[in-house]
A protein has these predicted regions:
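Acyltransferase
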Residues: 156-167
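Cysteine-nucleophile active-site neighborhood
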Residues: 28-102, 108, 165-166
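Short acidic active-site motifs
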Residues: 17-22
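Short, charged N-terminal beta->alpha structural module
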Residues: 1-6
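Short hydrophobic/Thr-rich beta-strand motif most characteristic of the beta2 strand and flanking loop
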Residues: 9-15
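Proline-aspartate-enriched helix->loop->beta-strand connector
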Residues: 23, 27-29, 153
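Histidine-centered divalent metal-coordination motifs
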Residues: 64, 113, 152
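Catalytic beta-strand/loop cores that center a nucleophilic Ser/Cys/Thr
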Residues: 96-144
Length: 167
């Protein structure tokens, strides 16, 4: 909804109902890999290969499962979280750059997940947001505008979520 309010021309596809070739043929100018249940490489459908293909070509944002796909694509460890976070908010501290530009730190973010990306983070990625418990809430590719957030920026209970998507 926020992306539509921001003027984006949105096309939505289930990750298991579109191929990479079909996605490429759409010639997107941005790509959002959205939430979903399951494990990133097992249940992510086209998402991991879409991240690999589009990184460096267009801006990419992975949300929740998409964030986990980003971590996994580059060899990061995705595993069970130390605590389940379904419908709970947490303060998130960030670096104030890229998707976090003009967003106060910390801010409250809505979370719905039972998996997280763990340290060590692959060399291609950097951690850009964490909780007070040091859970990774944001990743960025070091060379390209490819980001991942573990929380739900689209939730009304995430402060500044619309600004994050605008960035």
């Amino acid at each position: 909804q926020y992306l539509g309010e921001l003027g984006a021309d949105i096309r939505v596809f289930r990750n298991d109902q579109i191929s990479l070739d079909e996605l490429i043929a759409l010639k997107p100018d941005h790509l959002v890999i959205s939430p979903g249940p399951g494990e990133p490489l097992k249940d992510g459908g086209v998402s991991p290969e879409a991240i690999k293909h589009f990184t460096g070509k267009i801006p990419v944002l992975g949300v929740c499962l998409g964030h986990q796909c980003l971590g996994a694509v580059y060899g990061g460890k995705v595993d069970r979280a130390s605590r389940l976070m379904h419908g709970k908010t947490s303060p998130v501290t960030h670096n104030g750059q890229g998707i976090f530009k003009d967003i106060p730190t910390p801010f409250e973010a809505m979370r719905y997940h039972s998996l997280v990306v763990y340290d060590p983070i692959p060399a291609e990625l950097e951690v850009i947001a964490v909780t007070p418990e040091e859970e990774i809430m944001g990743l960025k590719h070091r060379q390209h505008p490819t980001y991942g957030v573990q929380f739900q920026p689209e939730s009304i209970l995430t402060e500044h979520g619309k600004q994050l998507l605008k960035n």
